[in-house]
Curated annotation (Swiss-Prot):
Entry EC number(s): 7.4.2.8
Any one Pfam family match given in the protein's UniProt record, by short name: SEC-C
Organism: Burkholderia cenocepacia (strain HI2424)
Catalytic activity, as annotated: ATP + H2O + cellular proteinSide 1 = ADP + phosphate + cellular proteinSide 2
UniProt GO molecular function: ATP binding; metal ion binding; protein-exporting ATPase activity
Example GO biological process: protein import
Protein name: Protein translocase subunit SecA
Length: 932
């Protein structure tokens, strides 16, 4: 109450910011008359002047009014578009590293030119991030005319581009590209073996278009670069037979034993998108798997030797119970293609992680692709937080303002519209059944069609859009369907969607990137005519002129009919997606209307509010076909949406807390990697590693400060000879001197190791040997980092179980992840030292060959894939999300690069599960077996 009172007096934070920016707009407007008088060359010359002032130490903030005025004037001359005052405010919001919420049709693409121009003057690069290649290319080509006029270079970063093209794109003052491509380039840059192979510069300033889609909807979906791991195709096929034999349990068992309506083998939690085997389900699964010969008779699924089977059991269960064809995925050309739940687009090339995709392939009886091993991964949350300054724009951010601020430190500012909005948002209508709801939708569409009003119908899945299309065909109403299956015709359909009597069905319109103009988008239609080579030039000109002549009449006709009418056939679990659909109507002060039609069968209502609303309808004895249209019901639906949003925020925040652990480790590894790449000579590093490793080896057998009776000299001699190529007569030294100490033995071994090293360097030359060392170091770091990522994935899978032992899973994860990381760093030192000390070379050519073989065998896994795998879709518990099905890599690092002199250099023949002969206490396959 006090807050409301104070807001009335002082205005909200948003109003105060807008008022503050309006003062700067007045300063910019005052400069307009003198800027207008400049010639084109003088206007272009302003860029050089600004650059010199920035180089001399003037801040971009101080330069803002002049730079914005110059950019506005250049836009007026080149693009024939002058920025409105509210667009100048939007530009300031972006420059100051905030999120600008601007209604659809308010010209976000033009707004971005202001901060992009200003920040590009510093010469450190500006990235403009869009959701797909089409928008990146469209916006870059459109705005390049303006930037080039002002003397700035523009690059486009698209998937599939050549390495040289990417380097040029990033070297430009301004680079347009997709969030995926920027993220993958960052990961690839940290996998290269030469500094000039990198493409990105330091991450300076990014303007993210559709920021809510990228930083929130896709925040749970990490970018993953992976290579193929062990093949389990047969197992997925066998496991696919299991779910149909299991029955779902209805109801959850309570403490008193009640609550189960129908006993079964598994429970389904649709809200959390998880599936769990019941006790009887475990027994049944174990019995069936034993019959099929997959586990021993009477064995438990939780036995150590069967633990990987559990992964396959749950993957198959999730595939059958939580993921449905034409809703979560489609089958196209013999492949399972994911459908993006937020935009309805097909995500070709993207695969679910943790074996789920293979389980769905088995379910649909298509070819099962191999599981993958993670080579590198990062979430968008952690990637975009690395930019020195980050800003974003969208039509709907205010509902997620808290999350933007909490996770990214980004404030959301709602920008006033240039003209007052005229869209009428009608109350939701709720029906008892889906049939009644669709009948009402068809009636509304028919009414609009007869009055000449264009309609956009939003659905939440491809399945629903095709059902509605079928009903419209039965009703004899002509229409267009815009969903992931119609991707190619998308732009053409949207261009026509504002014409009179036009009916367009669309799966979520989020991120479509094209405005629906009342009367049709004449510019878009003209562009299609221009692009058609089959039409003669004079015919093109005639058709385009006719288009423009007709447009004014059609525009007024549609306005008179009420503008674009939006029909939502279901509420999305996010209010923001609903608002995006509504936002397609009423652009730039045009008339428009919207209404949502719901039924009690809708997932959101069924899970969160169905019983309450159904009891109201029953009490009111509502006849069939009658709808509830009441504010209280709409508010209860919005309350349910808020609950889902809060839960999703908690999931994203928790995921971030887990990912921050690997992110901190990633930063350390990538920093070390970059230092390695840039160093010409790493002798000091190699020497420090060698001294550390040799000290550890000697201390195992001759402890520090110990007496002779505690020493195991024969074992030390053998270890040095077999593992480190050091043939030393330490026993003789001990026998000859009665006063020899542990320190003197260590010094003697260290001196021998240093001499051996210097002899190799002298044989081939310092420069050649340094290059070899760097190659070995990079390959070892990369391979062990990959294995570490796999270990972290496995750790995260089971960490939630620590809660049962009254331990905090997050704290346990941090502690164990740190221990794994420390062990990995030790392993890097051990392996690099072992390879460098064991390599036998007589000439620089041999050394070069050894380095090449190490690089070929360790560095480039075959069939590398780029995934945007979805954690949440895999239905894993929050603390149990994994980056990818991660099998341990077994790249043979040394192999043919190592030749041993004499029989003493060979490793003893031992079984993979036997204790390692080095005395570490580990199994051979986990220790020296990795190298043999």
């Amino acid at each position: 109450m006090t807050t409301g009172f104070l807001q009335k007096i002082f205005g909200s934070r948003n109003q105060r910011l807008v008022k503050q920016y309006q003062k700067t707009v007045a300063t910019i407007n005052a400069l307009e008359t003198q800027i207008e008088k400049l010639t084109d060359d003088q206007l272009r010359g302003k860029t050089d002047e600004f650059r010199q002032r920035v180089a001399a130490g003037e801040s971009l903030d101080k330069l803002l009014p002049e730079a914005f005025a110059v950019c506005r004037e250049a836009s007026r001359r080149v693009l024939k578009m002058r920025h409105f005052d509210v667009q100048m405010i939007g530009g300031m919001v972006l420059h100051y590293g905030k999120i600008a919420e601007m209604r659809t049709g308010e010209g976000k693409t033009l707004v971005a030119t202001l901060p992009v121009y200003l920040n590009a003057l510093a010469g450190r690069g500006v990235h403009v991030v869009t959701v797909n290649d089409y928008l990146a290319q469209r916006d870059a080509e459109w705005m390049a005319r303006l930037y080039n006029f002002l003397g700035l270079s523009v690059g486009i970063n698209l998937s599939g581009m050549e390495h040289d093209q990417k380097q040029q794109a990033y070297a430009a003052d301004i680079t347009y590209g997709t969030n995926n491509e920027f993220g993958f380039d960052y990961l690839r840059d940290n996998m290269v073996y030469e500094t000039d192979a990198r493409v990105q510069r330091a991450l300076n300033f990014a303007v993210v278009d559709e920021v809510d889609s990228i930083l929130i909807d896709e925040a749970r979906t990490p970018l993953i670069i992976s290579g193929q791991a062990e093949d389990h195709t047969e197992l997925y096929v066998r496991m696919n037979a299991l779910p149909p034999l299991l029955e779902r349990q209805i109801g959850e068992e309570k403490a008193d034993g009640t609550g189960v309506e129908k006993p079964g083998d598994y429970t389904l939690d649709e809200k959390a998108r998880q599936v769990f085997l019941t006790e009887s389900g475990h027994e049944k699964a174990e019995r069936l798997l034993a019959e099929w010969g997959l586990i021993g008779e009477g064995e438990s699924l939780y036995a150590p030797q069967n633990i990987t089977l559990m992964h396959h059991v749950y993957a198959a269960l999730r595939a059958h119970t939580l993921f449905h064809k034409d809703q979560h995925y489609v089958v196209q050309n013999g492949e399972v293609v994911i459908v993006d739940e937020f935009t309805g687009r097909l995500m070709a090339g993207r695969r679910w992680s943790d074996g789920l995709h293979q389980a769905v392939e088995a379910k649909e009886h298509v070819k099962i692709q191999s599981e993958n091993q993670t080579l590198a991964s990062i979430t968008f949350q952690n990637y975009f937080r690395m930019y020195a300054k980050l800003a974003g724009m969208t039509g709907t951010a205010d509902t997620e303002a808290y999350e933007f601020n909490e996770i990214y430190g980004l404030e959301t500012v709602v920008i006033p519209t240039n003209r007052p909005p005229k869209r009428i948002d009608k109350q939701d209508q709720i029906y008892k059944t889906a049939k009644e709801r669709y009948d009402a939708v068809i009636r509304d569409i028919r009414d609009c069609y007869e009055r000449g009003q264009p309609v956009l119908v939003g659905t939440t899945s491809i399945e629903n859009s095709e059902l509605l299309s079928h009903l419209l065909k039965q009703a004899g109403l002509p229409h267009e369907v815009l969903n992931a299956k119609q991707h190619e015709r998308e732009a053409a359909i949207v261009a026509e969607a504002g014409r009179p009597k036009r009916i367009t069905i669309a799966t979520n319109m989020a991120g479509r990137g094209t405005d629906i103009v009342l009367g049709g988008n004449a510019e878009k239609q003209a562009a299609f005519i221009e692009a058609d080579d089959a039409i003669p030039a004079d015919e093109k000109a005639r058709r385009i002129q006719k288009l423009h002549d007709e447009w004014e009449t059609l525009h007024e006709e549609v306005k008179a009919a009420g503008g674009l009418h939006i029909i939502g056939t279901e509420r999305h679990e996010s209010r923001r997606i609903d608002n995006q659909l509504r936002g397609r109507a009423g652009r730039q002060g045009d008339p428009g209307s919207s209404r949502f039609y719901l039924s009690l069968d809708d997932p959101l209502l069924r899970i969160f509010a169905g019983d309450r609303v159904r009891s109201i309808m029953d009490r009111l004895k509502m006849p069939e076909g009658e709808a509830i249209e009441a504010g209280i019901v709409t508010r209860s639906i919005e309350s349910a949406q808020r609950k889902v949003e809060a839960r999703n925020f908690d999931i994203r925040k928790q995921l971030l807390e887990y990912d921050d652990v690997s992110n901190d480790q990633r930063k350390v590894i990538y920093q070390q990697r970059n230092e390695l790449l840039e160093a010409h000579d790493i002798t000091e590093t190699i020497t420090a590693m060698r001294h550390g490793v040799i000290t550890e080896v000697v201390r195992q057998f001759v402890p520090e400060g110990s007496i002779e009776e505690q020493w195991d000299v024969p074992e030390l001699e053998e270890a040095l000879r077999n593992d480190w190529q050091l043939d030393l007569a330490i026993q003789e030294m001990v026998n000859e001197s009665s006063s020899i100490t542990a320190e003197e033995i260590l010094d003697a071994v260290m001196t021998a190791a240093d001499e051996q090293y210097e002899a190799k360097v002298a044989m081939v030359g310092r420069e050649s040997f340094s290059a070899f060392e760097r190659s070995v170091m990079l390959q070892t770091v990369d391979r062990l980092w990959r294995e570490h990522l796999a270990a972290l994935d496995h750790l995260r899978q089971g960490i939630h179980l620590r809660g049962y032992a009254q331990k905090n899973p997050k704290q346990e994860y941090k502690r164990e992840a740190f221990e794994l990381f420390a062990a990995m760093l030790d392993a890097i030192k051990q392996e690099v030292t072992r390879i460098v000390m064991n390599v036998q070379i007589q000439s620089p050519e041999q050394l070069e060959e050894a380095a090449e073989q190490i690089e070929e065998r360790g560095g480039h896994l075959e069939n590398v894939e780029y995934q945007h795998a979805d954690y949440a879709d895999a239905g894993a518990p929050v603390a149990n999300v994994t980056a990818a099905a991660a099998a341990t890599a077994t790249a043979d690092m040394v192999g043919s690069a190592m030749t041993h002199s004499g029989p003493g250099g060979e490793m003893p023949k031992v079984g993979r599960n036997d204790p390692c002969p080095c005395g570490s206490g580990k199994k051979y396959k986990q220790c020296h077996g990795k190298l043999s």
